[in-house]
């Protein structure tokens, strides 16, 4: 078990232990290295008109109130195409047999049958903004601001609110600190939001994932 220099065991280690032991404490709202986070066994993508529900973060890229990244909910396609189609984007998704995976595709159809899918900007070994169309005017997404991340590690889903970071810093954070297996960065700036038991930031946002 890892510990801090003062002997304390941090939230990262404690939440990892809880996941491995099968603890019944999810969804769990914790701060990991100072960043608000929701850890859960599963997610349900939603696109509602009311205030942000409990245990939710703001979602992926949208335009005029509608999602413009790949989005599948309950096996039904909400948005079929990538944000910068025909350029592909990274998509975190759950298969019908319960596996969580990631792929870089241009359409939801390329994933086959899935329970849910959330497109975004690929992180970790998939971090390549130019390959996913985030160049020119669209590179504004990479600026230093608040961002949200959807990630996966050890059977758990992570919804993370990253405060005042560039996309490169977000990528380094989820790689070096959270040590996620898969992750996509979602929309940021004025739309970044989290609503959890303790963490409540910008909860009036309307496009999000629970």
Regions found by a protein language model. Give the residues of each.
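Short, well-ordered strand-loop elements centered on a beta-strand within folded domains, enriched
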Residues: 1, 34-39, 97-106, 155-162, ...
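Conserved, well-ordered active-site substructure
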Residues: 65-86, 135-210
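Polar/charged alpha-helical tracts
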Residues: 15-20, 31, 49-51, 74-76, ...
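Zymogen propeptides
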Residues: 1-85, 101, 159-160
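Short beta-strand scaffold segments in enzyme catalytic cores
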Residues: 1-2, 26-31, 38, 90-94, ...
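A broad, low-specificity signal marking well-ordered, structured residues that form hydrophobic/aromatic
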Residues: 54-55, 90, 100, 121, ...
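Short, flexible beta-strand-to-coil junctions
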Residues: 42-44, 61, 94-97, 153-155, ...
């Amino acid at each position: 078990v890892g510990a801090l220099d003062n002997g304390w065991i941090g939230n990262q280690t404690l939440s990892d232990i809880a996941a491995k032991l099968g603890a019944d404490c999810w969804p769990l709202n914790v701060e990991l290295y100072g960043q608000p986070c929701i850890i859960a066994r599963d997610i349900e993508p939603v696109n509602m008109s009311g205030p942000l529900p409990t245990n939710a973060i703001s979602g992926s890229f949208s335009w005029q109130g509608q999602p413009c990244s790949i989005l599948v909910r309950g096996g039904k396609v909400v948005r079929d195409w990538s944000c910068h189609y025909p350029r592909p984007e990274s998509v975190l998704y759950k298969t019908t047999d319960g596996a969580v995976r990631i792929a870089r595709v241009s359409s939801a159809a390329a994933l086959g049958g899935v329970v849910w899918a959330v497109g975004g900007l690929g992180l970790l070994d998939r971090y390549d903004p130019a390959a996913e169309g985030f160049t020119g005017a669209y590179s504004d997404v990479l600026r230093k601001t608040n961002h949200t991340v959807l990630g996966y590690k050890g059977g758990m889903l992570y919804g993370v609110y990253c405060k005042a970071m560039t996309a490169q810093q977000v990528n380094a954070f989820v790689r070096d600190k959270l040590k996620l297996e898969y992750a996509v960065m979602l929309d940021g700036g004025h739309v970044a939001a989290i609503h959890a038991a303790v963490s409540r930031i910008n909860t009036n946002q309307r496009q999000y994932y629970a």
